Amino acid sequence: MISIKKFKKIFKIIAITIILVFLGYVGVYLYAKSLDKLPITSANSFYMYDNKKNLFEGTNDEWISIDKISPYLINATISIEDKKFYKHHGFDFLRIMKAMFTNVMNGKNLQGASTISQQYAKNLFLDFEKSWKRKIDEAFLTMRLETHYNKEEILEGYLNTINYGGIFGIENASNYYFGKSAKDLSLAEASILAGIPKSPTNYSPISNYDKAKERQKIILESMVKNKYITENEMKEAYNTELTFIGSKSEKKSSILMYYQDAVLKELETINSIPTSFLKTGGLKIYTNLDTNAQKLLEDRIKENIDSENELQISAVL
């Protein structure tokens, strides 16, 4: 049980922080408004090569306008990532205060409060460094986006560049996972895809189906709470059996997908480069993968293991 003295101290810290944040917000807003627009064109691709320097993975920039994206996907994303997106000017101060209080009370960083605008600014222009300078840069860039672009433009850019499990942009992701355009996504499909950006490796429906379904349930419940769908629609979507084209695609095997995710994860954890930044960097990534031997290995597995068998086999050369 927290003491009254400690509670007053925490309250004082939060109150002072709120005042400073507000004053800083006004100053940044006025300065950002006086500057020119930031360029928010489609980001560069990343390219991944095998041990013989042959390209086996590269993202294509399929930028689509917001009116060509399923309303289910848009509403699912807003519900789970930033439910006040259309109401705030780049920052959700109530959410920030709640996150600060939770983190101070627990003594660790348990809860984030980034809006879609903040995430987009971070993904486009910043690296993975964790510092106060980076936080200030993020706030400033967010304000520049908000002062020069409308909500539809920001959301369109965000959805066209975000990481969906190694597939960047909603049109690429929709085609990869379901073999269809983003405008044709059903509620069940959209709620699965909207859950991936939070943690692309953990919530990929191909590599972590159970976790992806847990995330989907949270998103659907959030959509009901925000009155985007009914409870019956939620239940129907959750119980819909989905077929993921990506896991059976001739273009990219599921094992290669795991390999790509592992490489991106290593770059993120060991080299401090986030997967989202890889999209904007236009990086060329050279690996030790032997694609010929890998294909031979996978063919042998397919010949000897029934696709319906519950036995799970994975190997990378």
Residues covered by each model-derived region:
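Juxtamembrane regions of bacterial inner-membrane/periplasmic proteins
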Residues: 2-308, 314
